[in-house]
Amino acid sequence: MPKSYFITGIGTEVGKTVVSAIVAEALKADYWKPIQAGDLENSDSHKVKKLVSNKDSVFFKNACALNTPMSPHAAAEIDGIKLQIKNIKRPETEKDLVIEGAGGLMVPLNAKEVIADLISKEDLVILVSRHYLGSINHTLLSIEALKSRGIDKIGIIFSGDEHPTTEAAIKKLGKVKVVGRIEEEPYFDEMVVKEYAEKFRKRLCEI
């Protein structure tokens, strides 16, 4: 039965797009970013498509493409768009689906809804945690936010140079499966993504 993998992060610019490409490549899954705010000519969907080398993945259009690189609720207001989850329909596919969120879990979509509300309890969530001072707190808070919503199928991918004490603390206190860690690579291309895809495939299937 097809699965949905929701890729989120402990903040912005932590590596969600690269992770989305790796997961899509590993599982030959389809890809969808519901909301894109800004950079429409070089969107995350474009970036993922360039990084995925398998010929099976389908790349679905954004449900909502906003012009301003801001939090979705603010970007939607500038564009005069009423952004509501009830109007965001998941694409139909018979394959696994990778869904990339925008920013972190509590990024607002409107006055009542946040990114986390896009996640189904059946989704497998990949939380991307980049190492920096304060990342343990941000990671554990993100895990707590997911679990408080009844979302407990969570895997974590660390991003950046190895930090054993940080990773050990998150693993012990967060009680989530660690899929792996992405090194501070000089660049990402199809070959680098494919290497990580092969490395992470087994653990992705175990979440």
From Swiss-Prot:
Q: Where in the cell is it found?
A: Cytoplasm
Q: In which pathway does it act?
A: Cofactor biosynthesis; biotin biosynthesis; biotin from 7,8-diaminononanoate: step 1/2
Q: Which UniProt keywords apply?
A: ATP-binding, Biotin biosynthesis, Cytoplasm, Ligase, Magnesium, Metal-binding, Nucleotide-binding
Q: Where does Mg(2+) bind?
A: T17, D44, E100
Record-level GO BP terms: biotin biosynthetic process
Concerning HAMAP family, the annotation shows: BioD
Protein name in UniProt: ATP-dependent dethiobiotin synthetase BioD
Q: Which organism is it from?
A: Christiangramia forsetii (strain DSM 17595 / CGMCC 1.15422 / KT0803)
